[in-house]
Amino acid sequence: MAQGLHLIWVIFCLHLICISSQQETEFIFNGFGQADLYTDGVAKILPNGLLQLTDGSGQKMGHAFFKKPFEFKSPRSFSFSTHFVCALVPKPGFIGGHGIAFVLSASMDLTQADATQFLGLFNISTQGSPSSHLVAVELDTALSAEFDDIDANHVGIDVNSLMSIASTPAAYFSEIDGENKSIKLLSGDPIQVWVDYGGNVLNVTLAPLKIQKPSRPLLSRSINLSETFPDRKFFLGFSGATGTLISYQYILGWSLSRNKVSLQTLDVTKLPRVPRHRAKNKGPSVVLIVLLILLAIIVFLALGAAYVYRRRKYAEIREEWEKEYGPHRFSYKDLYIATNGFNKDGLLGKGGFGKVYKGTLPSKGQIAVKRVSHDAEEGMKQFVAEIVSMGNLKHKNMVPLLGYCRRKGELLLVSEYMPNGSLDQYLFNDEKPPFSWRRRLLIIKDIATALNYMHTGAPQVVLHRDIKASNVMLDTEFNGRLGDFGMARFHDHGKDPATTAAVGTIGYMAPELATVGACTATDVYGFGAFLLEVTCGRRPVEPGLSAERWYIVKWVCECWKMASLLGARDPRMRGEISAEEVEMVLKLGLLCTNGVPDLRPSMEDIVQYLNGSLELPDISPNSPGIGSFTPLIIGSNPPVSPSTKTFYTSSSANDSTFVTHSIIHGDGR
């Protein structure tokens, strides 16, 4: 009898211990005024009970964890439910931010992580490492191409890596409409988030503050947490980070339970208020006003003294025939100011026709200005007419040309600024993350669509004449846009172009250019070289390599002959690769660079090949013209070093002669 009572007493004590342990990891915080949390970085609890992860400064991160670990006795009991309210508030004068994450981590010490796109979770060494023992639900408000983000407003599930195993645009399920409604994370408004785990399934649900928990989760993914946390123990908390993109990141309330049934609901009426940050606007003092008036008088006198000099400095060439192009003409003064005097700090790049600078115009926003040297007055009217016509062409995969300016011996071309630069930076710059095959193929399709429009869809046939990776720009979504139309020429459909100019870049120029001049087939040749360049991750001409690898066309053809065509692809290519697609694009590149112009496909056919609506012709490395690369060199010898070489060319159109000089670099620029 005594032994039975003793056994019952032991079982009762163990039950009390389990209940106590469970209660220690179940809580509700309607504000964090009384919460005992571990914080580091810039994270802190404000006097009103608001948990602030970041304080509006750049390149910072902050963490906040519940101090007691969440433990499970067996994988079957591996479950939890949590509910929190967050707010991401933009900082006045800044764009965006890098978002926050709800974190499950084997350790509370994440101080070795990096801010910015790493969200305070990983650094370049721990990113992707299984030893990180970390799972996160990210609310990401910045598009990071290196992590294959889908957009700049998404929710993702991360396991030891910021390359999410599942992600979707931020939204919540509307019970009234029976569909998902988009929700903006970086709005400054409080957002509810539920994270439920059980049965090896992780569910994430979002909703605005005053809406009850939707019946359908936004994101659901099978995941075995016992594999990530073999010790069956982890800490729960939050992480936030900023970079050059800055926002204020707050947690208003948080509740946690081991199951959904016992999860306590946050009382939204008790949650602390989110501060609204406004730009400081203090009225100027009397002394400051007087000083400003005196300064204005001095400046006015100085401007008056320099007026004549400045008029001469900013003098432009304006002729009668330019009146019809008035809306497309910019003043030199406006462009000079927009580019901060063509400051070298704003230099985006330089090529055969001149340098490109970044600028900002109040009416147009951010722009790119290319300064083209042009001493010849003959043919200028035709050139300007074609530039203006180019600006009238509208296509989603062409960099919009906004207009021009003429001054003395130079022409300035103004286009929209592309924030992600040119494609060649991601192909040949080791400081940039190499693109995946999927992204490369999408960019290839973008440029094919643009060229097809220029050849067949525009009012006149437009020949680009300089298709290469450095002339392919990337917009905010990393879509490919064909740019740099300084060499473009027009002609009517069904007629031959009236040009005999051999302009362009070595390796992209069709062999027949020197004899028959430019036509759509020569553009196709340049596009073929571009296909090989993007897929192989090397320039069409590489004098530094062995002789048999100099010219990409011959080298890819030789790889095909050796039954190793796939081996020609860029070895740095990330992500999953479709061998069938890669081989198709390489073969299409060889078909486009066929030495016989009549055997090259049209851009219309090329678009269908790339979209899979038309099969590639049955060709082999021994087919006529395939791999018969004869580089067009205006001179006596092929390039043997990446030194600068100058070519003088001329073209005629409408009985006018336009003389230019093109500086073509051996490195393909």
Curated annotation (Swiss-Prot):
Residues 1-22 form the signal peptide. Pfam families: Lectin_legB, Pkinase. Gene3D superfamilies: 2.60.120.200, Phosphorylase Kinase, domain 1, Transferase(Phosphotransferase) domain 1. The active site is at D466. It catalyses: L-seryl-[protein] + ATP = O-phospho-L-seryl-[protein] + ADP + H(+); L-threonyl-[protein] + ATP = O-phospho-L-threonyl-[protein] + ADP + H(+). Glycans are attached at N123, N180, N203, N224. InterPro entries: ConA-like_dom_sf (IPR013320), Kinase-like_dom_sf (IPR011009), L-type_Lectin-RKs (IPR050528), Legume_lectin_dom (IPR001220), Prot_kinase_dom (IPR000719), Protein_kinase_ATP_BS (IPR017441), Ser/Thr_kinase_AS (IPR008271). GO terms for molecular function: ATP binding; carbohydrate binding; protein serine kinase activity; protein serine/threonine kinase activity. One of its GO terms (cellular component) is plasma membrane. The chain crosses the membrane at residues 286-306. Keywords: ATP-binding, Cell membrane, Glycoprotein, Kinase, Lectin, Membrane, Nucleotide-binding, Receptor, Serine/threonine-protein kinase, Signal, Transferase, Transmembrane, Transmembrane helix. Its EC number is 2.7.11.1. Residues 307-669 are cytoplasmic. It is found in: Cell membrane. Residues 342-614 form the Protein kinase domain. ATP binds at L348, G349, K350, G351, G352, F353, G354, K355, V356, K370. Residues 23-285 are extracellular. Residues 24-257 are annotated as: Legume-lectin like. It is a single-pass type I membrane protein. In the C-terminal section; belongs to the protein kinase superfamily. Ser/Thr protein kinase family. In the N-terminal section; belongs to the leguminous lectin family. This is Probable L-type lectin-domain containing receptor kinase I.6.
